[in-house]
């Protein structure tokens, strides 16, 4: 009888350990947002001086962000604008998002914004450009990007979840993936 009770209590203890382990794994396992990345919340403004709260204040629940880190990546972002016909296709909400090292002062940020305005003289371009002043490495890590060597086209929602991401210049297959993700989900 003593052996049976010891065995039964061992089985109960083992069962409890298994249940607790399963629960811990379910809670700790990565969900889609953790796997793809998450855009941190921040306040910014377009080059037209319109304030924007990102991601909560995005114009659509699914927005295409063309993220660049270096001036020479502008052509990669431009290839997406041309390839997806973003300047004419109002069905896609989008923005340019250059990620810039924060100079640390309001005057330094103003100087960078003034240089950007020289590079983007058109009001339509300025309205779509939202500079992000932050630590680039932290941004790359949070959003789940591979580094700063290429630009990225990223679909984000208003909660900041990265729903899709592609790297580099426009490509028809990559564009198909982004278009599918940009489509609203019906139930």
State the predicted function of each range.
Residues 11-24:
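Bacterial N-terminal signal peptides
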Residues 1-8:
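N-terminal secretory signal peptides that target proteins for export/translocation
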Residues 29-54, 126-128:
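N-terminal "domain-start" segment that seeds a small globular fold
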Residues 57-77:
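Short active-site neighborhood of thiol/selenol oxidoreductases, capturing the structured segment around
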Residues 95-97, 110-148:
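Short, internal strand/loop/helix patches
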Residues 149-187:
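Thiol-/selenol-based redox modules, centered on thioredoxin-like
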Residues 71-82, 178-187:
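Short, solvent-exposed cationic patches
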């Amino acid at each position: 009888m003593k052996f049976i009770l010891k065995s039964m209590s061992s089985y109960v203890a083992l069962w409890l350990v298994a249940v607790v382990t399963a629960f811990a794994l379910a809670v700790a396992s990565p969900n889609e947002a953790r796997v793809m990345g998450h855009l941190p919340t921040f306040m910014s403004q377009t080059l037209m001086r319109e304030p924007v709260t990102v991601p909560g204040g995005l114009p659509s629940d699914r927005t295409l962000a063309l993220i660049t880190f270096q001036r020479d990546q502008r052509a990669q972002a431009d290839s997406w604008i041309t390839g997806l016909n973003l300047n004419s296709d109002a069905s896609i909400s989008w923005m340019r998002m250059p990620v810039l090292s924060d100079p640390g002062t309001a005057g330094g940020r103003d100087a960078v914004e003034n240089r950007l305005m020289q590079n983007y003289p058109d009001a339509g371009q300025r309205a779509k450009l939202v500079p992000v002043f932050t630590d680039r490495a932290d941004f790359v890590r949070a959003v789940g990007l591979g580094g700063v060597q290429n630009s990225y086209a990223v679909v984000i929602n208003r909660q900041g979840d990265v729903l899709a991401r592609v790297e580099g210049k426009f490509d028809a297959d990559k564009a198909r993936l982004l278009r599918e993700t940009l489509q609203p989900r019906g139930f």
